[in-house]
């Protein structure tokens, strides 16, 4: 499948700790088998050097919004023009991919002619460069299972899809809230199967700060770019997340149809809220706060 998959990414500047974890992530992509084509976008510091040293394709120019943030539409468009691959995967540049990634994509492709494959990240504190000259994956995955924290269903860090899936993409700013939910919504609205690959191919998100964004994390989630992305996302009774996946790729490679995951989680959260409210007198006597009780509430299971 080497010629059939192209991974595309828009890294941040390769400076300090973010430079270390991006180099870790992108190097891991070169180790999956068969090796995919990899396209790195942007003029950010260190991008060209990283591409040259790892034998990647580098496309320097990319359309940006008024704040200088790259636009998803141009990245998708340029990738399909520059590569002959049948499949593409947009991956955030701090995500370490396991060897099972390409195998998972192949399973999904054999089942569906059209699809969107996504996955939840597991957050892990990684401070040093990984040594890829030895068996790096097994120790890292063991540490991930021991120390990592599985992100919520909103933590979507890759999108894999066949050529021609995304057309008429609005000017969404990448790395800002709502751009990833838009990708899931687009597929679901068109009847395209959305496959959650998390159980089969766990991905590692290396934790980092938000110093690369002028307004910090607040700008990413609640700044004007987030507001603009929400406008392009459109009306919503709810956000499309990994809970909106129609299928789940199991650890044994089987595809399981999923129903009503979002609705079940919403019902559990509503029931827990009712429990918290009804037990207020008892909790008050015990000195338990509502916020602490809610924080201990129902967690997602198997989603």
Please place each PLM-identified region on the residue numbering.
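Conserved catalytic core of nucleotide-sugar-dependent glycosyltransferases
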Residues: 80, 96-181, 185
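N-proximal low-complexity "stem/linker" segments adjacent to membrane-targeting elements
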Residues: 1-27
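Short, hydrophobic beta-strand segments that form beta-sheet elements in well-ordered domains
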Residues: 36-43, 117-118
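Short loop->beta transition adjacent to catalytic acidic/histidine clusters or analogous donor-positioning motifs
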Residues: 4-5, 27-39, 56
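Active-site-proximal specificity loops/subdomain of glycosyltransferases
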Residues: 40-91, 98-99
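C-terminal catalytic/acceptor-binding lobe
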Residues: 5-11, 172-303
């Amino acid at each position: 499948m080497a010629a059939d998959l192209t991974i595309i990414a828009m890294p941040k500047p390769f400076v300090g700790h973010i430079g270390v974890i991006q180099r870790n992530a992108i190097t891991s992509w070169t180790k999956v088998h068969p090796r995919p084509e990899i396209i790195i976008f942007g003029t950010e510091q260190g991008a060209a050097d990283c591409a040259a040293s790892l034998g990647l394709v580098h496309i320097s120019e990319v359309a940006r919004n008024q704040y200088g943030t790259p636009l998803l539409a141009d990245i998708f468009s340029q990738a399909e023009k520059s590569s002959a691959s049948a499949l593409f995967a947009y991956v955030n540049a701090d995500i370490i991919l396991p060897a099972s990634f390409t195998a998972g994509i192949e399973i999904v492709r054999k089942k569906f002619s059209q699809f969107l494959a996504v996955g939840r990240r597991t957050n892990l504190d990684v401070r040093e460069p990984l040594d890829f000259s030895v068996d790096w994956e097994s120790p890292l995955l063991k540490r991930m299972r021991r120390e990592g924290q599985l992100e919520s269903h909103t933590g979507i860090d890759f999108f894999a899809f066949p050529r021609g899936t995304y057309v008429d993409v609005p000017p969404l700013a990448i790395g800002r809230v709502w751009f990833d939910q838009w990708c899931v919504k687009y597929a679901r609205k068109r009847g395209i199967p959305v496959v959650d690959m998390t159980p089969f191919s766990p991905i590692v998100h290396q934790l980092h700060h938000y110093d690369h964004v002028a307004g910090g994390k607040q700008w990413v989630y609640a700044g004007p770019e987030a507001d603009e992305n929400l406008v392009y996302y459109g009306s919503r009774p709810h956000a499309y997340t990994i809970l909106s996946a129609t299928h789940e790729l199991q650890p044994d490679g089987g595809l399981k149809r999923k129903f009503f995951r979002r609705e079940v989680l919403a019902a559990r959260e509503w029931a827990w809220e009712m429990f918290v409210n009804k037990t207020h007198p008892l909790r008050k006597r015990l000195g338990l706060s509502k916020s602490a009780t809610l924080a201990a509430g129902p967690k997602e299971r198997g989603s």
